[in-house]
Amino acid sequence: MKIGVLGLQGAVREHVRAIEACGAEAVIVKKSEQLEGLDGLVLPGGESTTXRRLIDRYGLXEPLKQFAAAGKPXFGTCAGLILLAKRIVGYDEPHLGLXDITVERNSFGRQRESFEAELSIKGVGDGFVGVFIRAPHIVEAGDGVDVLATYNDRIVAARQGQFLGCSFHPELTDDHRLXQYFLNXVKEAKXASSLK
């Protein structure tokens, strides 16, 4: 199984390490042709407007949308969650606009720039330490969206079919259960596409 990590900014190496720890091959993606042959893609954290500028500069917006349209799974963490969202509070336009969620940027407030919180994640388990760094949260989830985790009544992880997103940085701990959950989804999508 081959998983891409969008390598424009953010904790790219940490995601590669997590994917490899789960037994899959990781490929750092900086050009659209590198999307070919991938089974899934991780959109790492960082700063969402910077990532969007780089996506535009490298001509990746359409290829990323086509990758998703082909039924390939995508996992957005922190700023990557913002890239996935169809709606962003305070912005007219989404970035990739793939998942039926509304996201608010830096929504835990400046004084809580970074913190850790123990989460219970549906399908993953309890005692998962979420590392939040200038984190967004999901303000609203559409009907087809499965809420996987909340923190202080805010949605911090959700899944809609092939799209998985979380507010925190799962790659910054040695708990790879969420990466494994994503890889399981990739495996399911791969089996489904081979049956078509």
From Swiss-Prot:
Alphabetical UniProt keywords: Glutamine amidotransferase, Hydrolase, Lyase, Pyridoxal phosphate
Known catalytic reactions: aldehydo-D-ribose 5-phosphate + D-glyceraldehyde 3-phosphate + L-glutamine = pyridoxal 5'-phosphate + L-glutamate + phosphate + 3 H2O + H(+); L-glutamine + H2O = L-glutamate + NH4(+)
CC per GO annotation: cytosol; glutaminase complex
Record GO terms (molecular function): glutaminase activity; pyridoxal 5'-phosphate synthase (glutamine hydrolysing) activity
Top-level taxon of the source organism: Bacteria
Pathway: Cofactor biosynthesis; pyridoxal 5'-phosphate biosynthesis
The keyword Repeat is annotated on this UniProt entry: no
A single BP term in Gene Ontology: pyridoxal phosphate biosynthetic process
Active site per UniProt: C78 (nucleophile), H169 (charge relay system), E171 (charge relay system)
Family membership: Belongs to the glutaminase PdxT/SNO family.
Subunit structure: In the presence of PdxS, forms a dodecamer of heterodimers. Only shows activity in the heterodimer.
HAMAP family per record: PdxT (MF_01615)
Protein name: Pyridoxal 5'-phosphate synthase subunit PdxT
Gene behind the chain: pdxT
